[in-house]
């Protein structure tokens, strides 16, 4: 069909989320080393245009909502050449401790998340 397989978008979301974390000085593995886990509990993608094989894309990642033990990442997949939005999506995550039960987001992580400017990722 000449375009990317639909499930690849969720892989791109994961890669973009990891890059977002690394840009702020922590890796997901750092959370696991501390006994925390941040599983995806909900995911959505709305396809607005196709991504063709070998097309260069960018994924804009923002945190749009923070709750006591959960946070939402939003993603916008754009064609790097034209800026056209191809896909918009989000993932909800719940912070869990080693007992695999939801726990409050630690103060230092919450502070970092609250410093992040919330913005509309669909605005170029």
Residue ranges and their predicted role:
Residues 51-56, 64-124:
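HotDog/MaoC-like acyl-thioester-processing domains
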């Amino acid at each position: 069909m000449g375009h990317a397989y639909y499930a690849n978008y969720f892989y791109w979301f994961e890669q973009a989320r990891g890059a977002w974390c690394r840009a702020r000085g922590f890796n997901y593995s750092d959370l696991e080393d501390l006994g925390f886990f941040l599983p995806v509990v909900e995911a959505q993608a709305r396809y607005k245009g196709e991504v063709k094989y070998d097309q260069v894309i960018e994924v804009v990642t923002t945190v749009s909502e923070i709750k006591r033990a959960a946070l939402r990442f939003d993603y916008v997949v754009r064609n790097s050449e034209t800026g056209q939005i191809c896909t918009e999506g989000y993932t909800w995550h719940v912070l869990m401790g080693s007992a695999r039960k939801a726990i409050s987001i630690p103060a230092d992580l919450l502070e970092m998340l609250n410093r992040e400017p919330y913005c509309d990722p669909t605005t170029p």
